[in-house]
Amino acid sequence: MPPAAVRRAPYRDFLQPALQRRFASTTGFLLALAYVEAVTLSRWNHLFWPWFPIGLPGIRTLAIFGSILPIIILRIAHSHMGLRTSNSPIDTIRRTAFSLATLETVITFAVSAWLFSQTYLFSIPADSNLGWITYYSGDRARLNERALFYTVNLIILGIVQGVIHISLDYDRMLLGRVKPRREGDANDRPPTGWEKFTEAAPAVVVRAGMLSMVVALVNYVVLYHFLRRWAWSWALSFFRIFYNLPKSNIPPSQAPWSLLMLGRSIWAGFLLCLLWYVADMAFRLQLGKEPLKNNQPLSAESKDPNGSLLNGLKSKKTRVSAFAMWELALIARDFDARRQAIFEDIDRKDGPMWSQLYVTCLSVLKAVEERVDNYGKPPTPPPAPAETAPQQPPPRLVQPPKDDNVWAPTAPPKGLRGAVGKVVNNVITSPGKTPAEVYLPEAKKRALEATDRILTQEQKDMLRPENVNTMVHTLAFKVLSTPTIGPVFQQLFGRRLTTAVFGQPYGEPSIYVNAAYAVSKLAVSSLAEDRYGNVQRDVPALIRTFTTIIKKLERFRDTLPIHWTDLRKTRECAEVEELLDALKDGLGELVTAFSPYSTDLRLTRADMRLAREAAEKPQRAAEAPAEQPRVPAVENGAAAAADGNAEPEMRQLR
């Protein structure tokens, strides 16, 4: 009896638990931060109870954590792979502004802010007079506008943060890129998540304080004046259900504004923004961790590690395939035993493990080549359905019915009477020229005469089509040069090149970078580890494919025209340059390793010469003048987006 086949567990069976563990650790960290904020809101009239978790601080901690819980759910539901690709920010706004995801995000942040505002109001001591209901004289209840002011301020802060969250695409999962280890940095280890967090913590605190201060000042000076009557009416309608409040919806004549209220609102907003930003950073650091468990690849726990990894690489879901490609690149660089197992796995159903990895990685890289080749071409129409032969009707036993038009008028009578009737009909139905044909030429003539009498020669010259076009272009350039509005409409070269190379609506550069490194590193390692010689058959095609893709990418980058709205006029694109660097590094290692065997591999001198030329990297502009103006960090987001650990404020609006 043959042994039972080993079940190949899908790669997602190992990836999903790892992501869930990271979500859980992030949630625990946020719970600890909620406890710290709960302690800061305690009234320190005792040495023990203000911080003891079993008591009011614990209840307050759960309430604060409940305000951040909708954001955690939102991040889990809306997280996606790849950067948003579009030619300009206005294209992104048009695509996402009125989508359901945008509406959910803004509402979720507003709800989170409202929950935190109520927790903050109930945590403040009673002598601060921040309760919703107050009693001025006797037992008559009155609505306290102080509480209304704090609530409105934090809800506005939530709406603003929701817009920022969508604009800077905080839902994107940032994955790492595996790069070759150079001589001298073999012992260097990447920074841990905690080291990254402590390094970025000061910037997070500053961002939280700045956003809270700006929103509080704008609300204090401008917004609350317009929202006051509506918010007062809504609050009265709600609290009349529980209290005997006045029937008048007119707010008090004097609003209770003071510098103390402004300071309290800034502090409350700072605590809330700190929760949001720390949650965002924790999610990015946790979800951007390498696909390892106990310093081993995730698929190592499978009974068939290579099969599970191959399942992930062939997955249709971008998240699964991206993590699997990242793991393959790590295996190619750091795990000798797994790399050896790949070369020795030759008895698979669909071919040796190396052959399937080779085809998968090259199909990923050739997708870039295909997009470049098809750029600017009309989409291929779907194939027409095959024409079927018409069925022959059965023979008729009787004559078919006539197909003449039964509603057609009868033929006019012939003779003198018919001729006279035809002439009369033509006279009646063709009375002459229409009013437009009669009066329109005369109106044009009168308008030209009036123009000659009223306008001067200079004014006539200004109204010529070429001068009007010049005025329109001048106005357009003035709008594009505006620092606040102009960048929204500019089609920068980097954005257009990224969109063309990585596709729409999302493109994940790490998949292509890791694929280029993994397949080239495995091929180079096969010289010492491939006992069966399966890899050498594919090396010539691999070198030629890398050479072709590099040449096409560089030609496309150098020939893509700069759009007239691009005022920078620079051919810079960090994402595409990073992909080119990965391809050049891989091709350079292939040429160096297999150059002595080029004749045996049937690689001609022309092939090797073209490969060496393609693998050469241009000299970077290290001697650039120091006084060159620095591009603001918010706009220069391409380089930051290419870095998996870039701060969100360093990203551009995509």
Go through each PLM region and give its residues.
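HEAT/armadillo-like alpha-solenoid scaffolds in large eukaryotic assembly and transport factors
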Residues: 84-92, 141, 170-185, 289-298, ...
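Alpha-helical membrane-embedded segments
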Residues: 148-164, 214-222, 254-289
